[in-house]
Amino acid sequence: MKLLLLLFFLNQPPVDTTAKSGRFIAMEYKGMSNCIYEITINDSLIMGAKVNGYITIQPNFGIGTSVPRDVMHNPEAYVNKKKAAKYQDKNMGNDQFISTDGQNFIIRRKDIKSVFINTTPKWGMGYYPQSGRIMIESPETAYNKTAIRDLILVGDQNAEEVLKMFK
């Protein structure tokens, strides 16, 4: 049985662990809870779209969502496709984007005071892999209600490549 499992994993296609241009997947803690964001970066804005709610380890006893262990290294496995589909309208304005989910955020790039990688593992992540934390400091605004964002890179992502997106 162990040999079959080993052969199964050895024959899996490689997971693309490089950050896609201007986009990455991150978790942010909200008190005792958390949520998953798809972060999109363009020339002037950083937009965080909530694409999944509370992520828990297994067994979750019906509370939250668990990412199966066999795909937990793939950042896309943390995204709820139904929630992500709400953001397919490329002509969505800022107000509509924010009203799609109250936890969404928009930060103007020119407002960023600092952005850096925190390599300290986030406590409470259980067995979920994390590739570092992107820390963004910016002023609170109507579109960004948190001055310091602690975005945990879930799965296998290259923190240095993600940081380059902000440069």
Report the location of each language-model feature.
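Sec-dependent N-terminal signal peptides
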Residues: 1-11
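Acidic, Ser/Thr- and proline-rich intrinsically disordered linker/docking segments
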Residues: 15-23, 27-35, 43-167
